[in-house]
């Protein structure tokens, strides 16, 4: 029997780690941050030097980034990714949470991947209006790996691909959790929430702005009419 002896390091082996971009998309509550954390920890176990970057305006968890079930990991806050370029060049793996909020996400990820870094981005793909969120979708053609996760619809328990805002705010960037957003399916996306229904009802109230005030006034007038009737008799 003959054996083939292969060298431990092949001549064609790269001299440094090859860079790549991995993108994790999906609605809120679909497990994007959990998957980002899992991938980063996998590299940490293999003794790679890792850095996680979080959006600085999300101050809910101090200097950590957190999943919705309160698993946390140390993170470097930033509003612009270019502000943490030096820190990023000193590591092998870069994790970016809430990538949709960073206006320079595309240029930064491409630059770091070309420097041999593994860049893992977790981001919302769409706004509460189901429109592209910032420039995050421009990262898709540049990425080696793209996955879109789904959540469970918080109104009917089917598969959920969208994020629905519960309040009446119109601006795109409103940071919050289950108090402000639901993950929903296509059918439930078009159903009005209780807050939206209350808001539309208030617009139709010509005299009094608060629900229930008209009922109080009617009771008040009824009491006055009874008093007038009793005094007349």
Swiss-Prot record:
The cross-references to Gene3D superfamilies, in alphabetical order and at most eight, read: 3.30.60.20, P-loop containing nucleotide triphosphate hydrolases (3.40.50.300)
Q: Which SUPFAM superfamilies match?
A: Glucocorticoid receptor-like (DNA-binding domain), P-loop containing nucleoside triphosphate hydrolases
The residues responsible for catalysis, as annotated, are 98 (proton acceptor)
Tell me yes or no: is Phosphoprotein among this UniProt entry's keywords. yes
**Positions carrying Phosphoserine:** 2, 13
Record's function text: Cell-cycle-regulated enzyme of importance in nucleotide metabolism. Catalyzes the first enzymatic step in the salvage pathway converting thymidine into thymidine monophosphate. Transcriptional regulation limits expression to the S phase of the cell cycle and transient expression coincides with the oscillation in the intracellular dTTP concentration.
What's the name of the protein?
Thymidine kinase, cytosolic
List the lineage, top down.
Answer: Eukaryota, Metazoa, Chordata, Craniata, Vertebrata
């Amino acid at each position: 029997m003959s054996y083939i002896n292969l060298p431990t390091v092949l001549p064609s082996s790269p001299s440094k780690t090859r860079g790549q971009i991995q993108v994790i998309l999906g609605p809120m509550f679909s497990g994007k941050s959990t998957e980002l954390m899992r991938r980063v920890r996998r590299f940490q176990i293999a003794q790679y030097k890792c850095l996680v970057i979080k959006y600085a305006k999300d101050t809910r968890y101090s200097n950590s980034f957190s999943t919705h079930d309160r698993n946390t990991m140390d993170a470097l806050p930033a509003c612009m990714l270019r502000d943490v370029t030096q820190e990023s060049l000193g590591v092998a793996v870069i994790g970016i949470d809430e990538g949709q909020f960073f206006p320079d996400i595309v240029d930064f990820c491409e630059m770091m991947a070309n420097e041999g870094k593994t860049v893992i981005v977790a981001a919302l793909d769409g706004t509460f209006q189901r429109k592209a969120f910032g420039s995050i979708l421009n990262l898709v053609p540049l990425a080696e790996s793209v996955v879109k996760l789904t959540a469970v619809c918080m109104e009917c328990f089917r598969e959920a691909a969208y994020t629905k805002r519960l309040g009446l705010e119109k601006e795109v960037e409103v940071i919050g959790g289950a108090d402000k957003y639901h993950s929903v399916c296509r059918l439930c996306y078009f159903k009005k929430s209780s807050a939206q229904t209350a808001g539309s009802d208030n617009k139709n109230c010509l005299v009094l702005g608060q629900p229930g005030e008209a009922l109080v006034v009617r009771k008040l007038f009824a009491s006055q009419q009874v008093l007038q009737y009793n005094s007349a008799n």
